[in-house]
Amino acid sequence: MPVPGFAESKLDLPQNPNFVSGTANFNINGNTLTIEQNTEKLIANWSSFNIGKENKVEFKQPNLTSTALNRVNSNDPTHIYGSLKSNGKIILINPNGVLFQEGSRVDVGSIIASTLNLKDKDFINDKYAFETEGLSREINNQGDIQAIEGGTVAIIASQIENKGKIETPNGAVALISGEKVKLSLNGNSLIQYSIERGVLNALIDNKQALKVDNGTIILSAKGVKEVKNAVIKNSGSLRADGITKKGGKIYLSASNGKVLNSGVIAANSQQNQGGSIRVTAENIQIDENSKISTVGKKSGGLIEIGGSWQNSNKEVFQATNTTIAEGTILDASAFDMGDGGEIVVWSDIHNSNSKTTVKGTLKAEGGKIKGNGGRIETSGRALDIDEITISTKSTDGVDGQWLIDPYNITISSGSDTNISGSFSASDNDAVINVGTLESALASSNVNVTTAGGGSQNGDITVDASITSSSSNDLTLDADRHIYINQNICSMGSYQNSLK
């Protein structure tokens, strides 16, 4: 039923609530609207839901898991300039858009803001199935959004832009772009999600800060299958650092589109093991000055860009093109104690159009006090590792491994081309610059492998002299023949292995 007594200005406070399910008491005192929710669940339809700059809306709910579904029936977007508070969970739906303006403040148990609708029946039965009923608009955040520890901030729309700050310690922040989206929640905690149907011009653009200490960050966009136009951009910071625990988890997923990163992605840990970062898309561009890290005090974490180690995890979508630009730093090292972590930069080696380009710095070093080096893989059907810098060194332990894995490989004084994996040929003739190889041997064990592919037989040819003074091992593992046309000289204690 409608509730009388609301202010005339629809820009100051929400207007004309109509109860669909549950009960609540409404009180307006000056510039503040207080909603005292009496039932575990509340459904209210509003003619508008705006909060003016000096205005406040507060939901007082029975407990942390109590939920209020607020649906806006208006042709205009929702504008939040002021303050929105709750001690429980708020769902705010407006198909014409939601704008959290600069200076706005949201303090809640959890919040889901969506331009996709949620049916009343599904909400009552704890089914969070969001779906568009026509064209949906964007959600833009320029303010501060904060949920309680262990809470969830989920934003669901066709296009999402964040120019503000979103934070929930030990919880989850999820920005999801699609036309049909399902969430699974346990109380305030996000358990899992799925995008059942993509949307045209899917876009997620983070220009500021998402922070979830010990938690999970998800940026996931799915476009229309035939168009493959989903885009995820990060020029800000995504941080899931572990303050007292293991580092958190960060996922960027645009399976039929592209991911562009020029910012910071970090799941480090000050006291424990580094966390995990996974970036998957058809095309991945990690631009210069990007910093991606899962550094841990006790051991390094996991960084997967474009795929998993030797495609061992079939659930990880394989990229077609993956580029790590010069100036980029990927770091999965241990800080004090423990082993270095794992870094994979991958594109689908079975796709004739795939290419991996790596020109940045990749580190999976052991702890400064004690610990072994980690492992790094760079793979792709065509591989360009010219100007790459690799380190899996250990101060007090065993140096780690760099895996390159293409098709035919020639080790020469020429530039690195068509290289993938420990050092493996990825497409027709692949070339590894001897300087790149020698530099890597100073801090890592190096495996050069071929599987045979393209129009080649899987041979390894050494056409330049290789000299190393380190104790690390060089392994040449060919699918067919190994041709040694120049000297391989060790002034250290390392072993050469020819297979």
PLM features: residue spans?
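Extracellular and secretory-pathway beta-repeat/beta-biased strand scaffolds
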Residues: M1-K499
